[in-house]
C-alpha cells in the first residue's frame, strides 16, 4: 500500500437547503469527491453529526463543521471558527457557548473548554511516549485518586477558569467531578497541521502525538468523538499517534486504527486485575478486566498495543506481577509494557490512602501508608522494578521501566543502573511502523 492510498479520504461536508416558511432545514451529505451519499431534514446536534460521520463515512473521512453549512442553534451565525456544544448537543458559536452555563450529567459538571492550545510539545519524550500531546478536555470523570494531573499547572494555574466554567473551587479536591470539552479540536487541528512547517522528532519521542495525557480520551461518547476526529487528521498526514485510555470504548474506533496501518498504537493503564482493589482508587474508571478485553480485541485485529502497568501497588507480590505479565503476553502480545511503582508524594497520595480505606481495602490502605517512610518506598520501588524487569526477561515480555527521579537518587549502589533506565532513549517498541510504499 502506498502512502497516497493510506491517506485516502478527507472531509465530508453538510450542505443546507434553505427551508420554506413551513419546512425544516434539509441537508445533503457530500463526500470529498462531491458525491451525495445521504439527505436528512432538521438541524443536527453535534452528536448526530459526529456519529453519522463515524457510521457512514470511510474510516479516514469525517464531516468538517468549518466546511459545512452549520449554523449556531442560538444566534444563527455560521459556524466557521471556534464552537462548542451544550450537554444536549446543540451546536453554538463561541460567543454563545462562552455565555452558556455548565450543566451536570451523571454527577459530572460539563461545559466548554476555552483553552486555545491545540497540540503542545510534551516532556513525556523522557518516558519514551511522545513529542507532542493533545488533550481533548480539561478534567476527567474517572477521578483516579493518585492522578498527577490535578497537581500540574494545567489545573493549578487555571483555577479562575475552572470556577467560571464549572463552578470548581478546588481543582485537585474536586478532580473527577468536572469535564470541559474541546469540541472543535478536530477542525482546529486540521488547520493547525496545514500551517505547521516543522515537526519535532527526538530519538526518545519519535515524533509521536499522544492522546491524551491530561484526561481520558475515550471516557464518554463526546470525548471519543473528538479523539476520532483528531486521530483521522494526524493519520491522514502520516503522523504517528499513541492512544492511552482506561476505557474499553476505544474499540469503537477500531476501523480507524486498522486503516492507519502502523501509524497508531493503542494502550491502557492496567496496574493489576483485581477489579475491586482498582475501583477503590480509580472510582470512575472501567474495570481493568474490561480494559484488558478491549486491548485483546484491538491486538487481534492486528493493531499495535502496549500496556502501562502503572502504578503498581505495594500489595502485589512477585507472583502477582508474574501472573499479570503472563496474562499480557498470552492475551495481548504487547509491543511493550511500561512499568512504574506508585509515588507517595503530593496531596493526591493522601487522597489515595483515604479512598482505599473508605472502600474497605484496609490492607491496601495500610501498605500505602507505610510508603510515606522514604526507606520503605525505596525498598518497595527497588523490589518491584527489579522483579518486573527480571520477569519480563523470563516470560519474553518487552519491558520499559519508569523509575522515579527521587527513587534513583536514593537507590544506593543501584543508582547508576536505574539512572541508565531512566535515561534510555528508546523503548522496545517497533513503532511507528508505517506501511511500505510499493
Segment roles from a protein language model:
Residues 2-73, 81-89, 94, 99-134, ...:
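Flexible, acidic/Gly-rich N-terminal and inter-domain linker regions that tether
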Residues 2-6, 19-20, 102-109, 319-438:
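Auxiliary Fe-S-binding modules of radical SAM enzymes
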Residues 104-137, 141-265, 273-276, 288, ...:
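Conserved Radical SAM active-site core
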Residues 209, 241, 266-268, 305-307, ...:
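Hydrophobic faces of well-ordered beta-strands that scaffold small-molecule active sites
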Residues 214-216, 246-248, 269-273, 310-314, ...:
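Active-site beta-loop-alpha junctions enriched in small/polar residues
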Residues 242, 248, 313-324:
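Active-site glycine- and acidic-residue-rich loops that bind
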Residues 255-274, 334-344, 364:
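Non-cysteine beta-strand/loop elements that form the S-adenosyl-L-methionine
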